[in-house]
């Protein structure tokens, strides 16, 4: 039994059925509604590239309801968002935590939104290592570089000084939509679609 709804449309050739995500893609809407991992990142990157090829001048809308996930997978999405020509508008529905919040903030300036009851959470990268001391040291250095890079990007995207980002991501930092707007993670709390 499929849990993905199907939409039936009338065309001049009869009826055509789509899964709901394919139908939304026709309207340039991409959904990130799961953990950020290699599979979700590949799907989102492919959709971003497809929509750019379809029309490089029309905005793309990325709806986010995600607890976060893999940094490398998230950075693949982030880099693609910055690389493609169309503006990517981000909209938080529900929760954007960790890498989900990072991607929310990475939307085109002026086009980053959250619905009124959304929750946004930022924090530092998580990592757990085991093995030889030398290997643990290598991984610790790597995660510190990643933390520095993520904080630097968040500082640029939010307009917050780097020191503020470093302090505020030291622990889980939860915000409602209005607090996220004041912080610079989003540009507007959207009550009704314009």
Curated annotation (Swiss-Prot):
One of its GO terms (cellular component) is cytoplasm. The active site is at 98 (nucleophile), 123. It catalyses: Hydrolysis of proteins to small peptides in the presence of ATP and magnesium. alpha-casein is the usual test substrate. In the absence of ATP, only oligopeptides shorter than five residues are hydrolyzed (such as succinyl-Leu-Tyr-|-NHMec, and Leu-Tyr-Leu-|-Tyr-Trp, in which cleavage of the -Tyr-|-Leu- and -Tyr-|-Trp bonds also occurs). GO terms for molecular function: ATP-dependent peptidase activity; ATPase binding; serine-type endopeptidase activity. Its EC number is 3.4.21.92. InterPro entries: ClpP (IPR001907), ClpP/crotonase-like_dom_sf (IPR029045), ClpP/TepA (IPR023562), ClpP_His_AS (IPR033135), ClpP_Ser_AS (IPR018215). It comes from Clostridium tetani (strain Massachusetts / E88). NCBIfam families: clpP, PRK00277.1, PRK12553.1. It comes from the Bacteria. The keyword Iron does not apply. It holds the Pfam family CLP_protease. Fourteen ClpP subunits assemble into 2 heptameric rings which stack back to back to give a disk-like structure with a central cavity, resembling the structure of eukaryotic proteasomes. Keywords: Cytoplasm, Hydrolase, Protease, Serine protease. Belongs to the peptidase S14 family. GO terms for biological process: protein quality control for misfolded or incompletely synthesized proteins. This is ATP-dependent Clp protease proteolytic subunit. Cleaves peptides in various proteins in a process that requires ATP hydrolysis. Has a chymotrypsin-like activity. Plays a major role in the degradation of misfolded proteins. It is found in: Cytoplasm.
